[in-house]
Amino acid sequence: QRVNRVSIGHSIEGWGTVNDYIRYPAQWNSILPNLKKFHTYAQENKSVDSSLIMCIMSLNYLDFPNALLKMHKEFPSFDFHVEPLHQPRQLRVNGLTRSQLELGLFRLNMVLRELREHITSKLENIKRFYQQSADQGTNQETRTKLIEYCSHMDHVRGINIQNYIPELQLNTQDRKINA
């Protein structure tokens, strides 16, 4: 049999150090060149469809608009598939502070103005998700679980989230809740 079409999905969770933290021990400086190779290959071989797949969670919520813009500029022929993460609870976006949720929504709206309509139309569900998340605000129990999760993962990995995603402002060393 002859294969007429191949679809490849590249699952990433952010751009740069955000992806490195979530996908630890992944290293962006090796991921990006590989994505560029696939992008070139897909452009040269019309029987290959490539897409970027991403789940929005508390750890990449603030970075997603930036990542979206960079993905679109770096890989214009790639399709995008983005969905909000609902489980596990400790990674839900309502573990972020209200100001972080509002900042993420502001950033997303700014980025959507820069993208072509055929891209933004695919992101209507994500825009609604960001708006609803900002409207609902912080869940203190989820925030506590997020801080505990990151503290545990930092301890196990021997790293510190502040070196990867400093704007989350999660003080995992003393587990204080900053809401």
PLM feature spans:
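Eukaryotic endosomal/vacuolar membrane-trafficking regulators centered on PX-domain-mediated PI3P pathways
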Residues: N34, F106-E114
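Flexible glycine/acidic-rich beta-alpha junction loops that bind and position SAM and/or redox cofactors
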Residues: S58-Y61, F78-L108, L123
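Radical SAM/AdoMet-radical enzyme domain recognition
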Residues: Q1-E83
